[in-house]
């Protein structure tokens, strides 16, 4: 029972002016929105990750060294 699904062929979609008008606006908008999301620092606030200058406190400016991994906490 072969047949068609009634959908438009992909080649018709790609050659359509309407497709390119819509996507020439939405695709760059997504990149700009993503860039603003990261560059403004909103991504740090939304996901709760520390900003680059907040990884270590003022008293500790380097990564901690684990000396007793299996010891009691």
Swiss-Prot record:
Q: Can you tell me which family this protein belongs to?
A: Belongs to the PsbE/PsbF family.
Cofactor(s) of this protein: heme b
| Keyword Protein transport set for record | no
Against InterPro entries, the record matches this protein to:
PSII_cyt_b559_asu, PSII_cyt_b559_asu_sf, PSII_cyt_b559_CS, PSII_cyt_b559_N, PSII_cytb559_asu_lum
Q: How does it sit in the membrane?
A: Single-pass membrane protein
Q: Does the keyword Acyltransferase apply?
A: no
> MF terms per GO, please?
electron transfer activity; heme binding; iron ion binding
What does the UniProt cofactor note say?
A: With its partner (PsbF) binds heme. PSII binds additional chlorophylls, carotenoids and specific lipids.
Subcellular localization: Plastid, Chloroplast thylakoid membrane
Q: Which GO BP terms sit in this record?
A: photosynthetic electron transport chain
The beginning of the lineage is: Eukaryota, Sar, Rhizaria, Cercozoa, Chlorarachniophyceae
* Quaternary structure annotation from Swiss-Prot or TrEMBL: Heterodimer of an alpha subunit and a beta subunit. PSII is composed of 1 copy each of membrane proteins PsbA, PsbB, PsbC, PsbD, PsbE, PsbF, PsbH, PsbI, PsbJ, PsbK, PsbL, PsbM, PsbT, PsbY, PsbZ, Psb30/Ycf12, at least 3 peripheral proteins of the oxygen-evolving complex and a large number of cofactors. It forms dimeric complexes.
Sequence intervals crossing the membrane: 21-35
Query: Where along this sequence does the record place binding of heme?
Result: 23
What's this protein's name?
A: Cytochrome b559 subunit alpha
- The highest taxon in the source lineage is Eukaryota
Q: Which SUPFAM superfamilies match?
A: Cytochrome b559 subunits (SSF161045)
UniProt main location, coarse = plastid
What the protein does comes down to: This b-type cytochrome is tightly associated with the reaction center of photosystem II (PSII). PSII is a light-driven water:plastoquinone oxidoreductase that uses light energy to abstract electrons from H(2)O, generating O(2) and a proton gradient subsequently used for ATP formation. It consists of a core antenna complex that captures photons, and an electron transfer chain that converts photonic excitation into a charge separation.
UniProtKB keywords: Chloroplast, Electron transport, Heme, Iron, Membrane, Metal-binding, Photosynthesis, Photosystem II, Plastid, Thylakoid, Transmembrane, Transmembrane helix, Transport
Pfam families of this UniProt entry? Cytochrom_B559 (PF00283), Cytochrom_B559a (PF00284)
Cellular component, GO annotation: chloroplast thylakoid membrane; photosystem II reaction center
What is the species listed in this Swiss-Prot or TrEMBL entry? Answer: Bigelowiella natans (Pedinomonas minutissima)
